[in-house]
Amino acid sequence: MVRQSVLADCLNNIVNAERRGRRQVLIRPSSKVIVKFLTVMQKHGYIDEFTEIDDHRSGKIVIQLNGRINKCGVISPRFNVKLKDIEKWVNQLLPSRQVGVIVLTTSRGIMSHNEARAKDAGGKILGFFY
């Protein structure tokens, strides 16, 4: 299997586990970007909790699922998004304004599109989930 992106593989594993009705999923390898992305998902209530396991290699993450994820994905290439253009991407990627989150990486860290609006920060789109 050819690994395209560590984050893309992680989100794909999460969606597949949700569709199968699993309560937890094991992700490997681990990375800082995946951990920050999962933190945003946890903050918005789409996953219950996750724990990092250090195996002295690339690391593992065990995620406890709660059944709220319908779809999540990575946007590749990571397009630059100005503050005024965030609304356009919300309309393209999410089913509704009230449902779902777009995750951005900004100079102030990885955050949701609502946080980026509040902090007046643009950045690059990492992915989305709803």
Curated annotation (Swiss-Prot):
One of its GO terms (cellular component) is nucleus. The keyword Hydrolase does not apply. It holds the Pfam family Ribosomal_S8. Its main location: cytoplasm. Keywords: Cytoplasm, Nucleus, Ribonucleoprotein, Ribosomal protein. It is found in: Cytoplasm; Nucleus. SUPFAM superfamilies: Ribosomal protein S8. GO terms for biological process: cytoplasmic translation. GO terms for molecular function: structural constituent of ribosome. It comes from the Eukaryota. There are 2 genes for uS8 in S.pombe. Component of the ribosome, a large ribonucleoprotein complex responsible for the synthesis of proteins in the cell. The small ribosomal subunit (SSU) binds messenger RNAs (mRNAs) and translates the encoded message by selecting cognate aminoacyl-transfer RNA (tRNA) molecules. The large subunit (LSU) contains the ribosomal catalytic site termed the peptidyl transferase center (PTC), which catalyzes the formation of peptide bonds, thereby polymerizing the amino acids delivered by tRNAs into a polypeptide chain. Belongs to the universal ribosomal protein uS8 family. Component of the small ribosomal subunit (SSU). Mature yeast ribosomes consist of a small (40S) and a large (60S) subunit. The 40S small subunit contains 1 molecule of ribosomal RNA (18S rRNA) and at least 33 different proteins. The large 60S subunit contains 3 rRNA molecules (25S, 5.8S and 5S rRNA) and at least 46 different proteins. This is Small ribosomal subunit protein uS8A. It comes from Schizosaccharomyces pombe (strain 972 / ATCC 24843). The lineage of its organism: Eukaryota, Fungi, Dikarya, Ascomycota, Taphrinomycotina. The gene is rps2201.
